[in-house]
């Protein structure tokens, strides 16, 4: 248990931030799962529609400090790479 006033305040602040971060990361997880589901079903049009939502959620989390900017860039790059692989596979076949 916290002994000082400042320690009590830090506990409250860290809990508030934890909740905010969970919401932001939850959005990223939800949209990413939707995106990957559409890719696995070869529903590329739907995947293209939801990709801006995923990228927006990732960028917002990075901007607010929930994700490091390099982590955000890596996640976005990975998603774009998967989409481009599916597109090239569909064009070649």
UniProtKB/Swiss-Prot annotation:
**Coiled-coil spans in chain:** none
One Gene Ontology cellular component:
cytosol
The reply to whether Cell membrane figures as a keyword in the UniProt entry is: no
Q: Which UniProt keywords apply?
A: Ribonucleoprotein, Ribosomal protein, RNA-binding, rRNA-binding
Q: Which InterPro entries match?
A: Ribosomal_bS20, Ribosomal_bS20_sf
Q: GO molecular function terms here?
A: small ribosomal subunit rRNA binding; structural constituent of ribosome
Pfam families per the UniProt record, alphabetical? Ribosomal_S20p
By sequence similarity, the record places it as follows: Belongs to the bacterial ribosomal protein bS20 family.
What's its job? Binds directly to 16S ribosomal RNA.
| Protein known as | Small ribosomal subunit protein bS20
The scientific name of the source species is Dictyoglomus turgidum (strain DSM 6724 / Z-1310)
């Amino acid at each position: 248990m916290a002994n000082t006033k400042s320690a009590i305040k830090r506990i409250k602040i860290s809990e508030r931030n934890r909740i905010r971060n969970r919401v932001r990361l939850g959005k990223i997880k939800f949209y990413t799962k939707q995106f990957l589901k559409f890719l696995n079903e070869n529903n590329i049009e739907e995947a293209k529609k939801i990709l801006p939502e995923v990228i927006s959620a990732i960028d917002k989390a990075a901007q607010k400090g929930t994700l490091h900017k390099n982590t955000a860039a890596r996640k976005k790059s990975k998603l774009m790479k998967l989409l481009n692989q599916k597109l090239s596979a569909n064009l070649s076949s």
